[in-house]
């Protein structure tokens, strides 16, 4: 979990911005969204395969 220490004369907005950056860097929100619902292993494999195919199509489209 990201944590920060508010610096002397640091505004709340600056501290909040640093905290948000730390949370994004840690991947905390991404992990929470991933674990929000249970996904069966077979469905997870299918989604992973579909995402890989989509990336491959996108990469092939961008490679000239």
From Swiss-Prot:
Cysteine disulfide links: none
Keywords recorded for this protein, A-Z: Ribonucleoprotein, Ribosomal protein
GO molecular function, one term: structural constituent of ribosome
Protein origin, superkingdom: Bacteria
GO CC terms in record: ribonucleoprotein complex; ribosome
Ribosomal protein in keyword set: yes
Entry-linked Pfam families: Ribosomal_S21
Biological processes per GO annotation: translation
Similarity remark: Belongs to the bacterial ribosomal protein bS21 family.
The protein's name: Small ribosomal subunit protein bS21
Organism of derivation: Oenococcus oeni (strain ATCC BAA-331 / PSU-1)
């Amino acid at each position: 979990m990201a944590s920060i220490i508010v610096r002397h004369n640091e505004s709340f907005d600056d501290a909040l911005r640093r905290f948000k950056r730390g949370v994004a860097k840690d991947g905390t929100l991404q992990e929470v969204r991933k674990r929000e619902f249970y996904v069966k292993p077979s469905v997870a494999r299918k989604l992973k395969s579909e995402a890989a195919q989509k990336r491959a199509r996108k990469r092939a489209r961008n490679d000239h």
